[in-house]
Curated annotation (Swiss-Prot):
Entry function: Component of antiplasmid transformation system Wadjet type I, composed of JetA, JetB, JetC and JetD. Expression of Wadjet type I in B.subtilis (strain BEST7003) reduces the transformation efficiency of plasmid pHCMC05.
Organism in which the protein naturally occurs: Bacillus cereus (strain Q1)
Protein name, entry field: Wadjet protein JetA
InterPro entries: JetA
Disruption-associated phenotype: When this gene is missing the Wadjet system does not confer plasmid-transformation resistance in B.subtilis.
Pfam families on file: JetA
Length: 460
């Protein structure tokens, strides 16, 4: 890997070092916009007119562009200053100038300038992130025709898109933290609410978080991607073919280097998609931390704004901004003193007396009532269904036989029909004295009840 200033000029970023850095940033974005319109080269005179128009617009708005302080020769008109701006861009190696047919000059962006401007423009635009696009593209690369015809390219590209997905999720996590710090610095509850329902909702909720956790969920293709990567790891023929493709395509110098590089890329893809739940959970936790921070800050500011300390500090702050003559002519008493009244004093605490419970009266129960309650309990116990009662019912119906069908059970009334449910319930457990057969039964109707006519066998 090369060093940074082996790839770009050493004084490249001096363009943004002066007091006109905001103006030069606009010129750079204007240059990048024209680069997209004229890919083969920007006509020098056209770019000069664009810069001249920008300078004149700034001056009409009352902004001062002191380009003369940064150049050796002073230019008075806007056309001359536009020329100096382009000459400075050329001197700092932001642009190259080519002379073509009929001595026309064209501006060409070096590779590093076009890439740096693309990154800067992306930062300023704060675009909506399509997280699922990275997953879908990775899935297509690993399962499409590219994986069969150019496996090395498919692996390298899938690792690149996986890294971009992970970077975007990490950026979202850090952006939430920045919004938390912004909320903590707000001094007014109105500012807190405006930031939450304005910037946070627009930049985080609408553009990233809501899509991430609903329609754009990143876990949709995760299992298929992991399955394909793990299958390739176990396929020696595919790995050899991918290594040969990497050597033939120039990605690697030899077969061993290709195998090592492709394995690392595949491990990285597997690691990213295996840890997706973890980073998504961190994003959820950070979002809830932000919401708690908004609530706590709003609650604190609403309480503080109603306090005496805030009101006094607010009055003193405005007094400090007033004219001294007004203060001299309109003095007022800050504290009003009144006679002490007994009602304003805190009442002394009274000692709590000893608790004295009410006397409990014991009512005697007659023998007749005791016998009646006892008989009621016996009747209630007789109605309770239990294992022994069901076992007795079934064995009495079998009358010494080894097996019978459930239709042979003696069903006399509705209470007996309830026994069928418990015969099923205990028929497949141990210790009941009987068991039900496993064969598919026939359904029959007997005395108005439909049930499966299973065979009951005596348990040895």
């Amino acid at each position: 890997m090369k060093k940074l200033f082996e790839c770009i000029p050493e004084n490249y970023f001096n363009l943004f070092a002066g007091k006109n850095r905001g103006f030069y940033a606009e010129v750079a974005f204007l240059l990048y916009e024209q680069f997209h319109i004229n890919r083969a080269g920007i006509l020098y005179s056209l770019m000069k007119d664009e810069v001249q128009e920008l300078i004149e617009t700034k001056e009409e708005l009352g902004e001062c562009i002191d380009i003369e302080d940064e150049i050796e020769e002073k230019e008075q008109d806007s056309a001359g200053r536009a020329n100096e701006v382009l000459r400075r861009l050329k001197k700092l190696k932001w642009i190259d100038v080519e002379v073509r047919d009929q001595f026309e000059e064209f501006i060409v962006l070096p590779v590093y300038s076009s890439r740096i401007l693309a990154v800067l423009k992306e930062i300023c635009e704060n675009r909506t992130i399509e997280y699922q696009r990275y997953c879908f593209t990775t899935y297509q690369l690993l399962t499409g025709v590219e994986a069969e015809e150019r496996p090395a390219s498919a692996i390298l590209e899938s690792e690149k898109y996986s890294e971009q997905l992970y970077d975007e999720l990490t950026i979202l996590l850090h952006n939430m933290k920045n919004h938390m710090e912004t909320i903590a610095a707000k001094d007014d509850i109105q500012q807190v609410l405006e930031h939450h329902f304005g910037e946070y909702k627009k930049d985080i909720i609408d553009k990233s978080y809501h899509r991430l956790r609903t329609s754009d969920h990143v876990s949709r293709y995760r299992n298929k991607i992991l399955e394909r990567i793990q299958t390739w790891f176990l396929d020696d023929k595919f790995m050899k073919r991918a290594a040969e493709d990497a050597v033939e395509s120039g990605y690697s110098a030899n077969w061993e280097e290709a195998m090592d590089g492709l394995s690392k890329k595949m491990y990285r893809v597997e690691e990213i998609y295996s840890n997706l739940d973890e980073i998504c959970n961190q994003i959820d936790a950070r979002h809830y931390q932000y919401l708690r921070a908004v609530l706590d800050r709003s609650r604190y500011l609403s309480t503080y704004n109603d306090s005496i300390n805030y009101k006094i500090s607010y009055i003193l702050e405005h007094i400090g901004q007033m004219d001294e003559n007004i203060l001299d002519s309109s003095l007022f008493r800050l504290v009003q003193l009144r006679q002490l009244q007994e009602a304003s004093l805190l009442s002394p605490r009274k000692k709590k007396g000893v608790y004295e419970p009410e006397q409990h009266e014991v009512n005697e129960i007659s023998d007749e009532m005791r016998e009646e309650l006892k008989a009621e309990n016996i009747r209630r116990m007789e109605k309770v269904m239990n294992r022994k009662k069901i076992q007795k019912f079934v064995l009495e119906a079998m009358k010494g036989r080894q097996e019978i069908e459930m239709s042979e059970l003696n069903l006399q009334n509705e209470d007996d029909a309830l026994y069928l449910i418990y015969v099923y319930l205990y028929g497949y457990s141990k210790g009941t004295g009987y068991k039900l057969s496993e064969e598919p039964p026939e359904f029959i109707t007997q005395k108005g009840y439909t049930f499966s006519n299973r065979t009951i066998k005596r348990e040895n």
